[in-house]
Amino acid sequence: MRFTTSIINEHRRFSSSSRSWVSPICFSEKKKKPSPPPESSISPVETNPKTKFISHESAVSLMKRERDPQGVLDIFNKASQQKGFNHNNATYSVLLDNLVRHKKFLAVDAILHQMKYETCRFQESLFLNLMRHFSRSDLHDKVMEMFNLIQVIARVKPSLNAISTCLNLLIDSGEVNLSRKLLLYAKHNLGLQPNTCIFNILVKHHCKNGDINFAFLVVEEMKRSGISYPNSITYSTLMDCLFAHSRSKEAVELFEDMISKEGISPDPVTFNVMINGFCRAGEVERAKKILDFMKKNGCNPNVYNYSALMNGFCKVGKIQEAKQTFDEVKKTGLKLDTVGYTTLMNCFCRNGETDEAMKLLGEMKASRCRADTLTYNVILRGLSSEGRSEEALQMLDQWGSEGVHLNKGSYRIILNALCCNGELEKAVKFLSVMSERGIWPHHATWNELVVRLCESGYTEIGVRVLIGFLRIGLIPGPKSWGAVVESICKERKLVHVFELLDSLVS
């Protein structure tokens, strides 16, 4: 199969994988007349060495290493030209995965069309992968189309796993009508009865929308079905929803019913729902009791359970208890993750102990736990809130030179602090650095900077900043305009007023 030209006919039929294919990702260009080959003294035998046969494994390996979609197609085509070679599920899967990741959707459609006439056995997982990618691109009709193609191309009835995957993607995207169509189709056309996983997705949907009563009705229907039964995931979802609606008493009762009446043992995920729920409600001591209950009943807490409790202590300002929990994690031999470290760092910074947070960052690096952008932003915010903007600027430069990935939020934290602390000269210089790196401040921040510059007697600089943002299409707020015009009029520099009017007109 070879993609040879640049225009694809969607209605064209291909009879076998030996026919030439049309590449939908090649755009038509005027073909240049090929240059004559350079003169060479090398013999024909030397210039045309025997090509090594590309096996399915080699084709898969080569395509996985190639990032460019056209390059992947070229490898796919080259393999198909070999005598006796027919592509299989593995090679098609890698090709389609690359194309859908690069949003070459026309190419994906063309290949799926060809697959209808292939004789090899395709696996359901190929279509599930396409569903996930189409869902990320908000192409929800295509998600349904991939589900329907399982029967057409793989020539098997979609499994309950396929229905669960498709339903979950549609529900998470808020596509209720498509979800309903899917369930009706599965019931009437495929004769499939919903399993626990499918029921759990429906429970999650109602909980997400705040319809807790409907969620309980789904659970009752699950019990009546005699086929599917609620599990720890079902109850965890319901309890999380109850906690979110400040119904902690009912959440605890449900937790007790799950154990005593249903005989379902809670797992670390269920316990985490309880810990997080109590922490959100400010009942951190009850959250700690849940952790103690876990240990007494042979369910060892994991990193996420400890992190949730630390976060709860931090929220109510109990930094010492958070530190004790942190030390307990280390004693158990568990390796704290980025979330755990960042949680405690944030606690230190909010308590005005940024130096302790920086020590913790050093410990984190020593333990080979990789800090993320949020971790660094916590430190920057801590330094800035303590009026240590110079150190924050130094850290920003140092981390940048070390290859640390910082986002626009990192820069905005420092600019906000400089404005709030009245360090206007530094703020203007830092604004220049940001613009050079293609990062723009938050709308409220640069408007505040303009106002502060004008109020502090730096009208000319304020005007330049305002005009600069106008030129890149950002619209100043009323306060900025008012501050600039008022300052100009006070200083009787009407030329600037006319410049502003010119900026508005243009």
Swiss-Prot record:
What domain of life does the native source organism fall in? Answer: Eukaryota
Q: Is Transcription a UniProt keyword of this protein? A: no
Q: Give the PPR repeat ranges.
A: 88-122, 123-158, 159-194, 195-229, 231-266, 267-301, 302-336, 337-371, 372-406, 407-441, 442-476, 477-506
Q: Where is this region: Disordered?
A: 28-48
Kindly give the Pfam families that the UniProt entry links to this protein. Answer: PPR_1, PPR_2
For this UniProt record, give its keywords in alphabetical order, as a comma-separated list: Repeat
Matching entries from PANTHER family are given as:
MITOCHONDRIAL GROUP I INTRON SPLICING FACTOR CCM1 (PTHR46128), PENTACOTRIPEPTIDE-REPEAT REGION OF PRORP DOMAIN-CONTAINING PROTEIN (PTHR46128:SF266)
Return the similarity comment. Answer: Belongs to the PPR family. P subfamily.
Q: What protein name applies here?
A: Pentatricopeptide repeat-containing protein At5g18475
Organism lineage: Eukaryota, Viridiplantae, Streptophyta, Embryophyta, Tracheophyta
